[in-house]
Amino acid sequence: MPRIGIEFNNVCNLDCSHCFRSIYRGGAENNKDLFLPLDVLEKILIEAKPLGYAHVAITGGEPPMHPRFGEALDIIAGRGYSYHFLTNARNFQKTLKAVSAQPLRRAKLAGISFSLDGATEATHDKIRGKDSYREVVTAIAMCQALGIEASIITTINKANRHEIDQLALLGAHLKVKRQIFGHQNPTEHNMGADLILPLGEWRAVERDVARVMTGFRHDISMAVGFYTDYYLPRCAPLTHDDLNIDYRGRLTLCCQLSNYRDGDKDGEDVVGDLKKESLAEALGKLMNLVNKVHRERLAMAVDPKQKDKLHYPCLVCIERFGKTSEEPMLVQMTGVRN
């Protein structure tokens, strides 16, 4: 289903060691610049409907920290969109109350995705902070009791790489609908924290995830960015099946590049300000950028010195759009083999 990813804010109540976003960590309720204005949200939804988009993926920051979170859900539901959102589960009872406050909000909720980065409290809390593991597990149990579809998203790094089997088992125990594993994108911060696995280990991670896919009843998958022998882009942002709107109301190429932690200024991936122009106008600019990226990838695919990089497409985009100056990971992109 074509969907729009919308960043509600650029604020979070955790300070996770692996986070790749440049985000305000702490209380910022009075800083309006960090929250998507609701009139901009409604404008985007009105303009996206005739283009065939019917679902909103709400991200952040921590989306429920938007001071008008419930009103934002009313706008989404009222415009006929289904939605889901990603959360770290902090203050989840308040979040659940907001979701359930109006019948249409609850009816249009397709599910809630939870960030869970360890099969044990020790591992998860080492990455995300004290008590966060219990908050996530409790929140998922609350969703199950209320009939809300819950999913788990895990970023694999050195701290939790050994827990893939246990994480899948935990997902089954918690009766989640789906479970997604993804690689850790590099930043100066998480490279400095020694969290990034060597690129040569990524294939082993993918094999472990592929193995657990067949051993459990719930849906287990790898997030886009895993090893591929198909050199030309086929991810949802580069086919326009996923649009990404940042918290400033701007159309960007991809959520994985948006507000990147090492970036000190806007890059070419920011294509249009939807406060000032229509979604159709900005989407035309995005199409031009996507066509440019396709041509660049084609040139790389026929260049023996460059084509090996294309096995990991997300890393290619991180390099292409200058999102990090962290060289060790980018150097490893040449010469990747099965």
Describe each model-derived feature in a short phrase.
Residues 51, 107, 174, 312-315:
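Structured loop/turn residues at beta-strand edges in well-structured enzyme cores
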Residues 15, 19, 95, 122-123, ...:
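Residues that scaffold the ATP/ADP-binding catalytic core of kinase and kinase-like folds
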Residues 6, 10-13, 229, 308-311:
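Processing junctions and N-termini across compartments
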Residues 1, 22, 258-338:
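Flexible mid-to-C-terminal extensions adjoining Fe-S/redox cofactors in radical SAM and related proteins
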Residues 23, 60, 116, 183, ...:
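Residues that line or immediately flank small-molecule/substrate-binding pockets and catalytic motifs
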Residues 12, 16-19, 235, 254-255, ...:
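Short cysteine clusters
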Residues 1-111, 324-330, 334-338:
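Conserved alpha-helical substructure of the radical SAM core
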Residues 105-111, 115-277, 281:
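Radical SAM enzyme [4Fe-4S]-AdoMet core and its adjacent flexible, acidic
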